[in-house]
Amino acid sequence: VKAFADSRPDADIVYGAWNFIGPDGEIQRAMKALPYSLNMHIWYGTYLASTALFLRRSTTIEEGFLLDERFHYDMDGEYYARLGRAGKKFVHYNRLLADFRWHGDNLSAPNIERRDMDAELKRQKQHGEDAAIKRIYGLSFSKHSCNNIMDGFMREAYRMKKAFLYLTTPWEK
């Protein structure tokens, strides 16, 4: 990764593919890294893994771009949106770079099966952070109902774009 980053001095962020690892230590699936799109990131959601993403300290952290600790579920998503909005260059390194262990204790792990107040409050807090990213870094209408319609439309549009990119982006493991 260092050699690639050194060969790309224009890169503020270098990222690549990763594996999801289950609680049993087995690979559940490999995740292909796709070209970065700020709008796809805002409207679809975070699709870059922090475990497979490297920051150039001199053009990010040392310039004051730090994590916003007010976010608990989508801290990476807000950070990447802020870096993208600031014009930082995300460079796709088309290699498998990391593993991400998925287990029930992950803060952002979904609680789809659970139907209790704690699980529902957690889901709503996650959605609230996602909505804040859309309102601050994306578009916003004064009518909340218009934002909901736009959010649904834009998410589906970028979900289709992501599917297209997944099919057409080459991948070297």
Per-region residue spans from a language model:
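Conserved donor NDP-sugar-binding/catalytic core segment of glycosyltransferases
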Residues: V1-Q28
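Conserved nucleotide-sugar donor-binding catalytic segment
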Residues: G16, G22-P23, R29-R115
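Soluble, non-transmembrane catalytic domains of enzymes that act on hydrophobic metabolites at membranes
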Residues: S108-E120, Q126-A132, I136-F141
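Residues within well-ordered alpha helices
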Residues: F4, T59-I61, K122-R123, I133
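A general structural signal for alpha-helical elements within enzymatic catalytic domains
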Residues: A5-D6, G84, R135-G138
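Membrane-proximal basic amphipathic "stem/tether" segments
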Residues: G128-K173
